[in-house]
Amino acid sequence: MKKQTGFTLIELMISLALGLAISWVMLDVSLNAVRNGQDITSNGDVIEKGRFMGDLLKREIKHAGFFGRIVSANVQSNSPQTNWCTNAPAVKQLTTPVFGLDNQSSLCSSINLLAGSDVLMIRRASTLTTAPGSLVASQDYIQSNFEDIILAKGVAANFTLKEIDGVTLAPIREYHQDLYYVDNNNNFKRRRLINGSNIIEPLIEGVDDFQLQYGIDTNDDNIPDTFNTTPISNDYSSWQNVKTVTVFLLISSEYSSLPDDKTYNYAGQTKGPLNDSKKRRLFSFSVSVGNQY
């Protein structure tokens, strides 16, 4: 009868060691794949949020000061900036279609801002016209021709301006008055004047900073001569001469990623290293303000 044999103790220990080594390699490969997947997801999340906010703010800043037709100097006002938290806009506010606050902690008594961040207000008319029969009584609208402008509630009798032929009613457009800011939970939000009420809309999460830099024309050639992060608040001439707005957005991912050991320098600010497990990216872009009167 053939004698049965088995593994020796040494052979068993070697096989166990090889098995552990192979298992460790497979685990390491799996963990690296998971980490790489999370990193790709986090990077895509940040890029998508930056792209969305970039497209939105570029469009809004570009349209700032668009009120339909070009109007004459009788719209001009040297009055200081009025309370921009109000839900009762006035024609004299239209002379500052771009207005901002620097390094704020609160806004409109009830909004807590991300400490040190900026606030941007955009005033403009819709690019679409509204028929007199479709006006909403509580909504603010603008009507303008080449000589005058009306800002009033949506009652057809309020809008009497005519085209150059003296017969055709001048176009009526919905009035937009929007505040852009980051709250103390790192959420980028927009406060919109809709139907006579200020409505807050969440836009994106994970904004670690929002800074603005303004290109100001000092010699009336419509070209920025100085770049300032803090134009004089309530000073009409400073804001009337803003020709460009540069936006800086520091955006972080929702998902965990590799530790962030970078330092970010922008608009006179320095942030980092933050040393947390978030993917971050600094987005910046400049937009011309082409509709100042």
Predicted segments, located by residue:
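Short, loop-centered acidic/histidine patches that primarily coordinate divalent metals
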Residues: 248-254, 290-292
